[in-house]
């Protein structure tokens, strides 16, 4: 089982209290706020912080926060709806591969500079590593995704028993789910670097999974716990 350093060690040497850092990171990824909005909101609490400092916290802490939350993840279903959508990074379109199960639970995501067979394979490998092997995959009309699945079945990366189908109607579920993520991205006013975009989107996906009830929060204080209490409990070693 993966071990984690005490939470105090994560914030050693920081000039700000860890509760402020956790609050800023969780709010930034959970709500339709820009970093400048957060500066004003935190300022109302008598704390002066710059928007660049908040963005630095997001990039520094989100990967570790996501790993710690993962300990409490509920299993996703085996019937996946897979699709990709476009977002802009430094003025260029990049591709966000995502999948949800038939209940709308987020399976995984993968940000790629290209929309091709290799990108689709990378997404599926990541999704299976982080969750489970699917029993069924519903795709859109993307030829690259269909080819990726065929080739992975031929090489044994995907079991031959995995059913594959193409249905725009069934994939409406994941397309609607894209909107929630993209609505959260919009106030951020664009990404300048690909790596920063990937980290930030991982935080947005984490926040969406929390909202969908994809974590065993009973171990973290239950339904009566506040968002701040849930985050503190989940991040504790």
What are these regions (language model features)?
Residues 1-237:
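Residue-level recognition of single "structural anchor" positions
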């Amino acid at each position: 089982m993966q071990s984690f350093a005490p939470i105090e060690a994560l914030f050693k040497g920081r000039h700000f209290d860890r509760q402020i850092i956790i609050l800023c990171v969780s709010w930034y990824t959970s709500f339709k706020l820009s970093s400048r909005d957060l500066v004003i909101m935190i300022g109302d609490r008598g704390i002066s912080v710059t928007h660049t400092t908040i963005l630095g916290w997001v990039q520094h802490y989100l990967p570790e926060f996501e790993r710690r939350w993962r300990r409490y993840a509920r299993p996703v279903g085996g019937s996946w709806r897979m699709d990709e959508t476009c977002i802009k990074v430094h003025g260029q379109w990049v591709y966000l591969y995502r999948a949800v199960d038939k209940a709308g639970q987020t399976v995984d995501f993968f940000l790629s500079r290209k929309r091709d067979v290799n990108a689709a394979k990378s997404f599926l490998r990541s999704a299976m590593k982080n969750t489970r092997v699917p029993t069924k995959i519903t795709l859109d009309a993307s030829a690259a995704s269909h080819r990726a699945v065929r080739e992975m079945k031929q090489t044994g990366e995907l079991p031959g028993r995995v059913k594959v189908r193409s249905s725009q109607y069934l994939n409406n579920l994941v397309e609607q789910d894209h909107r929630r993520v993209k609505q959260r991205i919009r106030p951020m006013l664009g990404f300048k670097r690909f790596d920063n975009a990937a980290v930030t989107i991982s935080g947005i996906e984490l926040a969406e999974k929390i909202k969908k009830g994809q974590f065993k929060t009973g171990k973290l204080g239950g339904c009566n716990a506040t968002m701040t209490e849930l985050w503190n409990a989940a991040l504790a070693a």
